[in-house]
Amino acid sequence: MQLNKLCNIEDWDRDARAATMRRILPYLPKAHTEFPKGMEHRKHWEFAQILDGLDQLNALPSDGLVLGVAAGHEEVLYDLTNRVRWVFATDIYGIGAFAGYEAAHTMLQDPDSFARCPHNRNRLVVQYMDALDLRHEDETFDAVYSLSSIEHFGAEAGAMTALDEQRRVVKQGGIVAFTTEVIVNDAPSLDVPDLTLFRSEQLADMCQRLPGLELVEPIDFSMSDRTLANVTTMEQAQADAQRSYVAYPQIVMELQGRQFTSVAIFLRRTA
């Protein structure tokens, strides 16, 4: 399976990918028996791509330690407790733009209340921590991951600082995996408060400049015509969310003339 790639609707055609989504989001097939068919959402893809990729790279030993950066209370955290010895969830819980929903302060006191998939509650540690200053020792973790987070850390400089911190705390030979937003049309990059949309060339260059990290494979930035056939504006998505509605497929988004989607990137620590 290609790991470093854009989200494409054809990824939902793989039975193994559908099985991962159904495992980590069990409440969705209960309500929609055909899930994920007909409910193609890039966030579900991010979850599954990271989990399947870490598994493919043998980065989840049974006695391993995994760190989630800016992890909120996403299902990936809980699913990983079934695979490794310890999972550390870190975020600025209760503070910032996501405090009201994805990073609620109550996650620090009662992580069980956010669990929506089977998990081992004795293997999850939740910590308040800034992604730009990870308070862990060097070479602690077998894998470090973040999901659609680095684009919120203060443009390219903040993203690079965060990824270098992740490199520092992962073991030699360990994996740093992340998803972020990448522009798929010819528009320039975008920096607005709390959000950066990267150009593919910019993101590839950033990965090449990260000291001590190497891509596990080249990044495939190709996107199918079938995927590009449906574009949802951010304004429409936000309006739909107000009435608890999602227009599927929700893979390619548009903001200020930039069409963008999710990309997954896996790097290995080499130094």
Residue ranges with predicted function:
Residues 2-60:
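Class I SAM-dependent methyltransferase Rossmann-like catalytic core
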Residues 67-68, 74-133:
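Class I SAM-dependent methyltransferase SAM/SAH-binding core
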Residues 129-144:
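A short acidic, Gly/Pro-enriched loop at the edge of an enzyme's catalytic core
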Residues 145-152, 181:
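Short catalytic micro-motifs in class I SAM-dependent methyltransferases
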Residues 153-165:
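A short, conserved alpha-helix within the catalytic core of class I
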Residues 173-181:
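Conserved beta-strand signature within the Rossmann-like core of class I S-adenosyl-L-methionine
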Residues 187-222:
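Conserved Class I S-adenosyl-L-methionine
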Residues 222-271:
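A C-terminal cap/extension of S-adenosyl-L-methionine-dependent methyltransferases
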